[in-house]
């Protein structure tokens, strides 16, 4: 067993951190493409809740399409059906941010962390001024 195999057994994102550089991960994190970079900026929104990755991947509501559709996150529907606290936080963002900004929110993986790619100044201001202590926000 090599170091990447050991890291993958600890968590799907660990091999990405092991490399120490930007990478693009596919599959469950085991397929890494070298030196992926983007000029995008991101706003990370993390609700102060715990979501079990194992619970989501074992959900009866989870289905995987044979053809990759990069416009959607196939874990979102399962997460909304499996975790009431996440559902409350997720739809709470819609009322705070409005439909336009809410549509830009994507999951970062199988947990509760979400992000907005290339947020504009107004969106950043709204998020920092309206989101209370139930989220951690990183820019």
Q: What is the meaning of each model-derived region?
A:
Residues 2-104, 117-139:
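ATP-dependent small-molecule kinase catalytic core of the GHMP/sugar-kinase superfamily
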Residues 107-112, 118:
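Glycine-rich beta-strand-to-loop/alpha-helix junction loops that act as flexible
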